[in-house]
């Protein structure tokens, strides 16, 4: 699934012309460059900087900690669950 398709599912406009093929979902610690992950709380914030996930659903407050691509979400866990239905 393309990153642009994930933005469409979330009802958001993609902020840049950056495109990535997301082939799966995984945890912050295990995700690779073509996988989507999420961070939904302070307990997981420590893993944001070291995560290799290609894109991470994250609240605005922690977006600057994502090294690859941050997708801003008011409820990262719920959005991740909704997107998982397409994988």
List each language-model region with its residue ranges.
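Terminal amphipathic alpha-helical/low-complexity segments used for targeting or macromolecular assembly
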Residues: 1-87
